[in-house]
Regions:
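Gram-negative outer-membrane beta-barrel domains
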Residues: 3-5, 20-200
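Bacterial N-terminal signal peptides
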Residues: 7-16
Length: 200
């Protein structure tokens, strides 16, 4: 899985570097060109020592290719911050000091967008999540605060509205898998967010 995700990231970088290879004239609703976006919302962890959430957000940028009059494919990279979450008392009472989780990291992936009309669209996305986190191990009797770096994945979906030809807003759900089995730490996070996108 790790090798697959790394290969996807390198492939995404290569595609972003070569937008001129695709046609610029694929229809009225499908979007094509460079874009940047930002999300803000609520990141929730419900696993082992953690059952809570915090303010979270993300930024991203990429290039979108029109595949047909309604469909486009974006190749994008970004960075996500998924907040700090307090541990449940069952775990934290056995640890002295900090018991909060923290999760963030870079992303590289694909975004498939379908335009229902000139104004409304839906999209699905996914790719590699290069997680950098810390938190308690999943051990009720002797939890330890550890740090980890791992290559995992993310996936999500959203519904958006084109306010103007260049600006759009959307409601989104994304899932970020973040774990290190060797260290027995698992911070899978659900992100519920609103987003804005600007297209150049």
């Amino acid at each position: 899985m790790k090798n697959t995700m790394l290969a996807l990231a390198f492939a995404a970088a290569g595609l972003v570097a070569a937008p001129a290879a695709f046609s610029q004239d694929a229809g009225q609703n499908a979007q094509q060109g460079w874009y940047v976006g930002a999300n803000a919302g609520y990141g929730q962890v419900k696993k082992g020592p953690y059952d809570d959430g915090d303010v979270a957000g993300a930024v991203k940028g990429g290039y979108r290719f029109a595949l047909n009059p309604e469909t486009s494919l974006g190749v994008e990279v970004g960075y996500v911050y998924l907040g700090r979450v307090d541990a449940r008392s069952l775990y934290s009472q056995n640890v002295g000091g900090n018991t909060q989780s923290k999760l963030q990291g870079a992303t590289a992936g694909l975004d498939l967008r379908y335009s229902f009309s000139p104004k409304w669209y839906g999209e699905v996305r996914g790719g590699a999540f290069f997680a950098k986190g810390e938190g308690l191990t999943n051990d009720k009797f002797n939890p330890q605060q550890v740090r980890f770096n791992s290559t995992n994945y993310y996936a999500g979906a959203g519904v958006g509205y084109n306010v103007t030809p260049k600006w759009s807003v959307a409601l989104n759900y994304d899932y970020y898998q973040a774990s290190d089995n060797d260290k027995n730490i698992h911070l899978p996070t659900n992100l519920y967010s609103v987003s804005a996108e600007y297209r150049f």
